[in-house]
């Protein structure tokens, strides 16, 4: 609806308490760094409890966002789908980050439809 990439993310405490949420606003803000995960991370403010946090995201995090998870030692990542884009979650898993891929059909369809209709914008988002 806003004309951007339909990916959202949220940062939670392990007990389920929402810390912050965000979405990909790269197009809306003309800023290539505003991916969903980075938006949620920034909105969460300064913290010292990242190992006890969970990042939940529509799609497997790209390398940029995977680096953020690694840099700040976020303890777990829950991924809506990894079929349309695999991202860096295998690397994060190898480093000890708990990874859960839900394989949610709604997320898969949402992204597949978006990619089919906006291939140039999508390729720009993932660095192609």
Which stretches of residues belong to each language-model region?
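Zn2+-dependent cytidine deaminase-like catalytic core
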Residues: 13, 20-112
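Secretory/periplasmic and organellar redox-cofactor proteins
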Residues: 107-128
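Short, basic/aromatic recognition patches
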Residues: 1-4
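Short beta-strand scaffold segments in enzyme catalytic cores
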Residues: 7-16
């Amino acid at each position: 609806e806003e004309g951007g990439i339909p990916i959202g993310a949220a940062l939670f405490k392990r007990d389920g308490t929402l810390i912050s949420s965000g979405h990909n606003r790269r197009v809306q803000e003309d800023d290539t760094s505003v991916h969903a995960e980075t938006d949620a991370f920034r909105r969460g403010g300064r913290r010292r409890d990242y190992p006890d946090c969970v990042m939940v995201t529509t799609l497997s995090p790209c390398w940029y966002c995977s680096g953020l998870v690694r840099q700040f030692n976020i303890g777990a990542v829950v991924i809506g789908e990894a079929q349309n884009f695999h991202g860096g979650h295998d690397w994060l898993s190898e480093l000890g980050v708990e990874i859960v891929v839900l394989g949610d059909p709604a997320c898969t369809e949402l992204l597949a439809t978006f990619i089919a209709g906006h291939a140039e914008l999508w390729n720009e988002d993932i660095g192609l």
